Amino acid sequence: MASWIFKLLLLLQCVLVLIQHADSSSIIRYLPGFEGPLPFELETGYIGVGQKEEDQLFYYFIKSENNPEEDPLLVWLTGGPGCSSFSGLVYENGPLAFKVETYNGSVPTLVSTTYSWTKVANIIYLDQPVGTGFSYSRNPFADIPSDTGSVKRVNEFVRKWLAKHPEYFSNPFYVTGNSYSGKVIPAIVQEISNGNYICCKPQINLQGYVIGNPVAYYDHDKDFRIPFAHGVALISDELFESLKASCGGSYSVVDPLNTECLKLIEDYDKCVSGIYEELILKSKCEHTSPDCYTYRYLLSEYWADNETVRRALKVVKGSKGTWERCDYRVLSNQDIKSSIPFHINNSIRGYRSLVISGDHDMTIPFLGTQAWIRSLNYSITEKWRPWMILDQVAGYTKTYANKMTLATVKGGGHTLEYKPEENSVLFKRWISGQPL
């Protein structure tokens, strides 16, 4: 009985939201926490996708500060699944960031950045899959999101967004993102490309994609954590050699009868339990402490949960409870097991791709990224070399015949935020066709 009452209440809430809202967009000139008018053009809104447009995907669109009529148009997808694109906007490559200071109960302070990709590109920061950030579903009984469902919905979103903003149809278009979205993005590129070939006019001026520390195939990616840990002196030679001998190089899917391998993996887990895997150089600490690096993530949650902020962003009232930067309750059917077939298809069609890898990320180690790129068997057009900023090594790069570029970021982590200036230089060079 109680469960039916709960479902009825959910249904009533959705009816109220439905009454309030259809596809909408608003120009935002001021944001709580930022002093004065915004120094860039921001639009927020919803686009309905899926059956009867039940899924309302929320976005932040920021015009290029250079030449928006001609500069590339990007859609940015944060990983998770379940992490809001607002995380990319304020922590990775957007024109705003939070001033890191102890929360005092007021609206957290926003400041301008120097490294935003919007210096040279128009960017749509998209909250997806549904349930992420401020996106929501009108149907409380909707199916659990899936990788393949996300592919179709992002494609639908992009086409509908461009129909409402036809002045951007001719701009070079790229799909961008990091972490888990790196597994889905190549499939989205293929879906958009298929639409261009098969059905949809006007065509999207699709040029390629950018993925940072991307998931390619989870079991494959995880298998490289132990070799990475050994390479950076987190585990001993003896433990590493024993793991190789007992587990045969497969550490993520282990035969339950192989007790020796399982015991050695337990020993490995103990060795690295105090390591912050997203950037092994950072301290692993309690995120509620202002001295902890991840404390800054709380500021976005305090900010987005403020009612004044929601009104400023034109968030539909009643559509979202507590906002979370990464809501891992947004379950997803991970039905794309590997991105590799999509990379192959996209390269055959001539799309450019940039794969960025922070070299101190143990979540998706650069060793695994290099391995799956090697498996594509692309010929090399430019051998491994350092790329530089002001005569200093910022990372290493290699270019392939099929328009794929791999670039590591020295001292970088799982996302762009750990080296935002270096990642900005890297992106600006690549997107303009300059050598890295």
Swiss-Prot record:
A molecular function (GO) term: serine-type carboxypeptidase activity
Distribution of this protein across tissues and organs: Expressed in seedlings and roots.
Keyword vocabulary terms for this entry: Carboxypeptidase, Disulfide bond, Glycoprotein, Hydrolase, Protease, Secreted, Signal
Residues the record marks as active site: 179, 361, 414
Gene Ontology annotations of biological process type: proteolysis
Enzyme kind, highest EC tier: hydrolase
Documented EC number(s): 3.4.16.-
Signal peptide start-end: 1-24
InterPro entries membership: AB_hydrolase_fold (IPR029058), Peptidase_S10 (IPR001563)
Positions annotated with a glycan in the UniProt record: 104, 306, 345, 377
Cysteines engaged in disulfide bonds, as pairs: 83-326, 247-261, 285-292
GO cellular component annotations of the record: extracellular region
Cellular compartments annotated: Secreted
Keyword Disulfide bond: yes
Biological function: Probable carboxypeptidase.
Protein family membership: Belongs to the peptidase S10 family.
Name of the protein in its database record: Serine carboxypeptidase-like 15
Organism: Arabidopsis thaliana
Gene name in the database record: SCPL15
